[in-house]
Amino acid sequence: MNILHTSDWHLGRTLYGRRRQEEFAAFLDWLLGCISTYNIDVLIVAGDIFDTSTPGTAAQELYYRFLARVGSTGCRHVVIIGGNHDSPSFLDAPAGLLRALDVHVVGQACTEPVDQVLLLHDDLGEPQLLVCAVPYLRDRDIRQAQAGESISDKEQKLLEGIRAHYAAVGMAAETVNAGLAQPVPVIGTGHIFAAGGQTVDGDGVRDLYVGSLAHVHAGVFPACFDYVALGHLHVPQKVGGQDHIRYSGSPLPMGFGEARQQKSMCLVQFAVDAEGAFVPQIELLDIPVFQRLERISGSLPDICLRLRALCEEGERVWLEVLYTGTEVVSDLRERLDELVAGSTLEILRIRNQRIQQQALEQELPEETLDDLNELEVFERCLQAHQVPESQHDELLHSYRQVLDSLHGRDAMAEDAGGQA
């Protein structure tokens, strides 16, 4: 049995206003070929299928076109869970129809833990694999707010809720497995931030919950999970040094900070040891680059030298340029655009640190929204309105709660008498 673990497609994502439809299409075409080549039986996509809870028609077309074609590769089952960027109701809406294609979608946490336990069968109808399809767990799914509770109380209850949810789903899987003639491997999924997880600058990874204590440790996953397929972090990595708990990472670089990162997916097979336990054998499958990204920094001569070298290579490259020279170059954009004119290079972003430093010295900050995240914008507002520093922590925490509420809201859900 061959299982392929991927995540964080972020279909519909742009890069500084540049659409990436061709990249996504190329990846999905390559993925179909990969599924055929490696005779994949089960494909697991661990959340953030889309980049937004209201995906555009082009992103939807890519998604459904892929699902319509994947059956022809010989892949018997596709398991998709919702991530924090996804709309649970949007993913779940066609779940009944997709089930007829052996595509199993769990967009949000279920009331009954057993409803998240998928028993997958082989071509002969024999049980082959159990998947505990745990999606991104929203605050409202696992914690009841109480008046007067402190920040640390909220964070602790959140962690307890995550642990309790996984424990309940794990117990349900063990019950199902115990009822089979022969036990089968158990895979758990999740879209979560593991403690110690590695991120990179500009990857767009959002905080999932208010506060940092909700970074879970490997011990949150039940011992019955023979492999844990995680999503949310874009860097391929193990969790807590445990080989069987992994982030596959995103298939495309989500920002220039990931430009030099080798993207991959996890090919998982199971062996049985002397004690009868299922042991995952994991191979990383490298993903090719569909659109080269390059980050260039240095003085103006250094930048120009590198740009000329890239022009000579003739490869299509998207660029981020960081000017760090000491000389003030007010027409940097014009000079660089002239240098790459008519070439295969496209400069998507230029950061002129010398101009920014000069502006700071003149007390005229030249920051743009591209340079700041949501929290930093709020911090600038506090400073601009001369809010006393003694009030900053409480206001920042309240603002984080507002952001968490907005990001966690399902924009595609309909309000029908309180039902979504």
Segments (PLM) and residue ranges:
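Conserved beta-sheet core of the metallophosphoesterase superfamily
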Residues: 194-269
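Conserved catalytic scaffold of divalent metal-dependent phosphoesterases
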Residues: 96-97, 101-210
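Accessory, non-catalytic peripheral segments of nucleic-acid enzymes
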Residues: 37, 270-420
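Active-site neighborhood of divalent metal-dependent phosphoester/pyrophosphate hydrolases
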Residues: 10, 40-58, 75-89, 194-205, ...
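Metal-dependent catalytic neighborhoods of phosphoester/phosphodiester hydrolases
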Residues: 15-16, 49-67, 82-101, 106-107, ...
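Divalent metal-coordination and catalytic microenvironments
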Residues: 8, 28, 48, 63, ...
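Active-site neighborhood of phospho(di)ester-bond hydrolases with catalytic His/Asp-centered motifs
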Residues: 6-7, 43-47, 77-84, 104-109, ...
